[in-house]
A protein has these predicted regions:
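Basic, ligand-binding patches in group-transfer machinery
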Residues: 2-47
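Soluble or luminal CAZymes and related metallo-dependent hydrolases
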Residues: 25, 61-65, 167
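A broad, structure-centric signal for solvent-exposed, well-ordered loop/edge residues
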Residues: 40, 49-51, 133, 141
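A short, flexible beta-alpha/helix-coil linker loop
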Residues: 47-52, 157-160
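Conserved SAM-binding loop and adjacent beta-strand
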Residues: 54-69
Length: 172
C-alpha cells in the first residue's frame, strides 16, 4: 500500500511538460517555463494558456494575442505614442513587442507575482532599460503612478477568469 504513495511522492516535477526548463511555486501561482524550438513559453497553474513567450533574439513570427495589442495606438486620431502601461506584465511579452515596434518608449509594467517577474528576467530577456517593472496589484499601483499614458493594456487574468476588481467602474 505504501509503495504507490512513495512512487508518487518521489516522481519529480509536479506537472512536467515536454521541454520544461523551470518550475516553481509562488504565493500566487504554480509557474513553469517550457522551451519548444527556439522559444520559451510561460505556463501558469493548470497550464491552460501561454502567459508570455520569447523567441531567441526577440523574433516574433506569428500574430498572437500579444501582437494584436500593437494595434491600440491606431484607434486614436494621432497614433504616435510616447509611453505606455501594461497591467498584467507577466514575463514581459507586451512591452517587449511595443519596444520592438515603437522604439524604446518608457513603459510601466505592473505584475502581481514577483516570481513571474524573476522568471521573465531569467528566461524571457525582461531586461530592457525602458521597461519599468512594478511588482504589485494592478489597480492599486496604477493609481500610485503619476502622469498619463498614451496606451494602457490590461492582460491580467487567471484562465479563464479576469480579477473582479479590474472590471469595476472605479477601475476604469
Amino acid at each position: 500500500l505504501l509503495i504507490p504513495v512513495i512512487l508518487l511522492w518521489t516522481r519529480g516535477d509536479l506537472k512536467a511538460y515536454e521541454g520544461q526548463i523551470f518550475e516553481t511555486e509562488s504565493s500566487y501561482n504554480y509557474i513553469q517555463v517550457v522551451r519548444w524550438g527556439d522559444c520559451n513559453y510561460l505556463l501558469l497553474n493548470e497550464g491552460q494558456a501561454f502567459h508570455s513567450f520569447y523567441c531567441d533574439g526577440g523574433r516574433v513570427d506569428n500574430i498572437s494575442v500579444w501582437s494584436i495589442m500593437l494595434s491600440a495606438p491606431y484607434f486614436s486620431a494621432d497614433p504616435t505614442i510616447d509611453n505606455a502601461a501594461v497591467i498584467g506584465l507577466a514575463a514581459g511579452t507586451i512591452p517587449k513587442q511595443f519596444t520592438r515596434v515603437f522604439g524604446a518608449i518608457p513603459i510601466d509594467g505592473i505584475e502581481l507575482d514577483p516570481a513571474i517577474v524573476q522568471a521573465g528576467r531569467d528566461y524571457f530577456a525582461l531586461t530592457d532599460p525602458n521597461i519599468n517593472v512594478i511588482v504589485g496589484d494592478g489597480r492599486y499601483e496604477l493609481n500610485q503612478l503619476d502622469g498619463q499614458y498614451d496606451v494602457i493594456t490590461i492582460d491580467a487574468y487567471k484562465v479563464p477568469y479576469i480579477p473582479w476588481h479590474l472590471t469595476t467602474r472605479e477601475f476604469f
